[in-house]
């Protein structure tokens, strides 16, 4: 049996008929607010439309609420996020803000200096990577191998028309692995899915991330190494001069800004497309796609899913690279 089992689904005239029993189309599953996502959509995950900003130079102590309150004086803030280190949970010193109107961005830029929590911050108009296509493919982690393909079709089909489902197989055991890939015919179902980072599918809780091409994954790794290197200097400075003085922590955000933000996240989410894009995509490669922290060993890296049982058999401890 090949390493990856692909199940290509025909493109139906009506996704409700192709993926669900006959009758009225089911509504998308209701999504309870997740404690892991402070805002419904991560503004860093969508291409810029003129009303999105990158905010660099943030203090470690600045929260989403602080940033939102400050920028609300320039116009209505629809959404905001501050990127955090996936290991420590500490702010990485930059974030993104989405205004309702593009005119608000102009107002922010008209002011030469912006100071928040005792620090000069660096707001810029967000850049989008050229030629970026809207995300249509998602990675589903933490999926029980016992979940049937029909269950997967039923759940994800409720969000929109599915083009393809990929169910990777373990090349040694010929058994299903604990994750899959879903490709939709357009990007709208992906946006709906990412309104919640975690979804109850079958018998377990699964994490949803946007599938990133390997070249994007590698670019993210290079960017994140720069950010983490600066972070180390920042933490050292903080110990020597007191909290909030580690200026080097923020040096890494310039690299992120210069590279553009259309493909960051992660992750949406990553860390992302929260799902948040701010999660490191390290340790796992699947074909031409790169995936991140937690997929080499879900039980060890993602405590949300629980520890693997000592007796073995827990599907969450078998995410090893090909």
UniProtKB/Swiss-Prot annotation:
Residues 1-36, 216-251, 299-322 are annotated as: Disordered. GO terms for biological process: regulation of gene expression. The modification Phosphoserine is found at residue 144. Dimethylation of Arg-310 is probably of the asymmetric type. The modification N6-methyllysine is found at residue 64. There is a cross-link at residue 112 (Glycyl lysine isopeptide (Lys-Gly) (interchain with G-Cter in SUMO2)). It is found in: Nucleus; Cytoplasm. Residues 51-133, 136-215 form the RRM domain. The modification Omega-N-methylarginine is found at residues 6, 310. PROSITE patterns: RRM. Interacts with TNPO1 and ZNF148. Acts as a transcriptional regulator. Promotes transcription repression. Promotes transcription activation in differentiated myotubes. Binds to double- and single-stranded DNA sequences. Binds to the transcription suppressor CATR sequence of the COX5B promoter. Binds with high affinity to RNA molecules that contain AU-rich elements (AREs) found within the 3'-UTR of many proto-oncogenes and cytokine mRNAs. Binds both to nuclear and cytoplasmic poly(A) mRNAs. Binds to poly(G) and poly(A), but not to poly(U) or poly(C) RNA homopolymers. Binds to the 5'-ACUAGC-3' RNA consensus sequence. This is Heterogeneous nuclear ribonucleoprotein D-like. It comes from Rattus norvegicus.
């Amino acid at each position: 049996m090949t390493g990856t089992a692909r199940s290509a689904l025909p493109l139906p005239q009506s996704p409700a008929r192709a993926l669900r029993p006959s009758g009225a189309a089911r509504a998308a599953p209701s999504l309870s607010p997740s404690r892991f996502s402070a805002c419904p959509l991560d503004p860093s995950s969508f291409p810029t439309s003129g009303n999105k900003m990158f905010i660099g130079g943030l203090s470690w102590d600045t929260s989403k609420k602080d940033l939102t309150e400050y920028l609300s004086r320039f116009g209505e803030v629809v959404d905001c996020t501050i990127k955090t280190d996936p290991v420590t949970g500490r702010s990485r010193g930059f974030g993104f803000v989405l205004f309702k109107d593009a005119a608000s961005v102009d107002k922010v830029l008209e002011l030469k200096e912006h100071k928040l929590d005792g620090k000069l911050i660096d707001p810029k108009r967000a850049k989008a990577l050229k030629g970026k296509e809207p995300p249509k493919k998602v990675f589903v982690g933490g999926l029980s191998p016992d979940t049937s393909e029909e269950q997967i079709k039923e759940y994800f089909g409720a969000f929109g028309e599915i083009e393809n489902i990929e169910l990777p197989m373990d090349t040694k055991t010929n058994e299903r692995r604990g994750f899959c890939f879903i490709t939709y015919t357009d990007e709208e179902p992906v946006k709906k899915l990412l309104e919640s980072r975690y979804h109850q599918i079958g018998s377990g809780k699964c994490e949803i991330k946007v599938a990133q091409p390997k070249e994007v994954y590698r670019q993210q790794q290079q960017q994140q190494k720069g950010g983490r290197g600066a972070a180390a200097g920042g933490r050292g400075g903080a110990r020597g001069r007191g909290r909030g003085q580690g200026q080097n922590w923020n040096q890494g955000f310039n690299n992120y800004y210069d590279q553009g933000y259309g493909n960051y996240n992660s992750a949406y989410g990553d860390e992302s497309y929260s799902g948040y894009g701010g999660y490191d995509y390290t340790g796992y490669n699947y074909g031409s796609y790169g995936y991140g922290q937690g997929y080499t060993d879900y039980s060890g890296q993602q405590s949300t899913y629980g520890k693997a049982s000592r007796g073995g058999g827990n599907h969450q401890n078998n995410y090893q690279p090909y």
